[in-house]
């Protein structure tokens, strides 16, 4: 168990883990924004602690972490081939615990090959924390406990599926 990270640190860890897959995975800004959010959600659902220090906002196309958006928007819709986002000062690599890496790898293996548009649809479908928060505006904060509750429910679904198939 460790302290929460900045969204930038989590994004850089996802980039690093993605590159180490066979074949390597590279992500567009939209994918990366959603993967960080999903990893934050699963961490809340499984460990009951946040993965990132920042709050998540409900934007038109789903949940967004504004600081991370500022770092990735320059890539447009292209894949990010850089090894790291940010600069020397804000991209210092963080220590990730075994549990955190396990969750990040699960998220990459489960969602990493899904394109940004589909990930966006998944994260702002009805019944999601985004849909409960978004009100035709920008920047409403999605309450962390709402995200935690949503991913706890998903976790229960996964667990009951495992029970019925084994």
Kindly label every feature range from the protein language model.
Residues 1-166:
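Domain-edge interaction signal
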């Amino acid at each position: 168990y460790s302290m929460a990270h900045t969204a930038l640190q989590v994004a850089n860890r996802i980039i690093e883990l993605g590159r180490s897959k066979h074949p390597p995975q590279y992500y567009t800004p939209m994918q990366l924004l959603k993967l960080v959010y999903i990893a934050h959600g699963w961490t809340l659902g499984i460990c009951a602690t946040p993965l990132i220090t920042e709050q998540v906002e409900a934007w038109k196309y789903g949940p967004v972490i504004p600081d991370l958006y500022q770092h990735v928007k320059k890539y447009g819709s292209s894949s990010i081939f850089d090894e790291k986002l940010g600069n020397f000062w804000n991209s210092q690599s963080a220590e990730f615990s075994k549990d955190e890496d396990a969750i990040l790898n699960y998220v990459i293996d489960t969602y990493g090959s899904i394109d940004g548009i589909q990930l966006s649809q998944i994260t702002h479908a009805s019944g999601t924390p985004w849909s409960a928060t978004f009100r035709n505006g920008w920047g409403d904060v999605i309450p962390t406990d709402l995200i935690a509750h949503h991913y706890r429910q998903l976790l229960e679904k996964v667990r009951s599926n495992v029970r019925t198939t084994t």
